[in-house]
């Protein structure tokens, strides 16, 4: 993903020897992890899989040590607890740490539900609350989360071609 590569180019120090948390780490998209070196990387997802270290819902994951960076790629449109997941990610972030995400934006076709293409999100099909949940996200969805105000110097990108929303910001 160009956004991840751009972030690494601008903030290369975060991709060497740092501690990362990735929510939704088992999905099939390219990861920031592949751009990192000697980082401690904890991948969290709702089912066992490649890149998954901890099986947990994103909003329920707990760890006593803060992270230098937290990320989620193409996850929030599938998460009915999206606001709680974002809050939890920010709570796990060190002051000055990076919050980075991508998700589906307005106009993106529904995917990963029993109505659309269940094979695209196999984990969610076994979870009643999740299997038919889908919502494209906007910057306003994130800004409405009280904890999101803890992030500063935010940078939003809307990719009109893929209908994706990208964001990176720093915890106060």
Task: Provide a role label for each language-model segment.
Residues 80-90, 94-172:
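S-adenosyl-L-methionine-dependent methyltransferase catalytic module, highlighting the catalytic core
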Residues 1-15:
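Class I SAM-dependent methyltransferase Rossmann-like catalytic core
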Residues 15-109, 167:
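Conserved SAM-binding loop
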Residues 11-16, 26-29, 129, 136-143:
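N-terminal start-of-chain detector that recognizes signal peptides
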């Amino acid at each position: 993903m160009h956004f991840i590569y751009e972030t690494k180019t601008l903030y290369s120090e975060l991709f060497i020897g740092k501690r990362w948390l990735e929510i939704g780490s088992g999905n099939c998209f390219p990861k920031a992890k592949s751009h990192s070196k000697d980082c401690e990387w904890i991948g969290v997802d709702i089912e066992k899989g490649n890149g998954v270290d901890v099986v947990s819902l994103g909003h329920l994951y707990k760890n006593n040590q803060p992270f230098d960076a937290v990320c989620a790629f193409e996850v929030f449109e599938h998460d009915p607890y999206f606001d709680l997941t974002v809050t939890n990610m920010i709570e796990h972030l060190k002051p000055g740490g990076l919050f980075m995400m991508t998700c589906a934006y307005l106009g993106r076709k529904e995917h990963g539900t029993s109505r659309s293409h269940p094979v695209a999100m196999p984990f969610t099909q076994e979870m009643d609350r999740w299997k038919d949940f889908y919502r494209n996200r906007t910057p306003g969805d994130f800004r409405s989360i009280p904890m999101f105000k803890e992030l500063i110097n935010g940078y939003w990108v809307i990719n009109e071609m893929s209908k994706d929303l990208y964001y990176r910001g720093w915890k106060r």
